[in-house]
Amino acid sequence: RKENPLPAVCGRICNRRCEFECTRGDIDQPLAIDEIKKFIADQELDPATRFIPQKMHDYGKKIAVIGSGPAGLSCAYYLALDGYNVTVFEKENRLGGMLTLGIPSFRLEKNVIEAEIDILKEMGVMFKTGVEVGKDVTVPELRTEGFEAFYIAIGAQGGRKLGVEGEDAQGVISGVDFLRK
């Protein structure tokens, strides 16, 4: 977790480019580094044995992270680890951003994302879902609640167009919209 706050997620969605360059493949086969990382990270997801990092300091300062995708979760992890009181605001009712809404479960199981988020919760990170900053609550309002800094990690939730004939036809939706439903 020192270099990667979401190791179980990365162990599942990594495209394994390093394996194609692994010199071990010159002898027999490359190291299956993604499977190794996945195995190690899975051991840490077990609530009975997982390691919860301790805060290095206790600054007592509140920071708002806007968005709970990988950037927001990573930011929340490192800020909490350093000793800040972090609250993550997510406009959707589910945490994880595109990890949850944009990656199918056969590729990244939802319970893995939830377990990674549970570690953040045990580190003291607070989460507020169904709250769109700028609409449901404003930055000035958050400042009056004591938040001194803001990290905006709203991501890129939209699907991409392919540039093919018929993609604007009625009933055609993006892959992201399909996964959300």
Where are these regions (language model features)?
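N-terminal Rossmann-like dinucleotide/flavin-binding domain of flavoprotein oxidoreductases
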Residues: 1-4, 17, 36, 99-147
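Glycine-rich loop-to-alpha-helix module at the N-terminal edge of alpha/beta enzyme cores
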Residues: 1-24
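Residue-level detector of alpha-helix initiation sites
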Residues: 5, 69-71, 94
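Iron-sulfur (Fe-S) cluster-binding segments and ferredoxin-like electron-carrier domains
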Residues: 16-42
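Glycine-rich dinucleotide-binding loop and its adjacent helix/turn
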Residues: 40-57, 115-135, 159-181
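N-terminal Rossmann-like FAD-binding beta1-loop-alpha1 element of flavoenzymes
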Residues: 61-87
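Short hydrophobic core segments
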Residues: 66, 89, 147-155
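Glycine-rich FAD pyrophosphate-binding loop
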Residues: 84-100
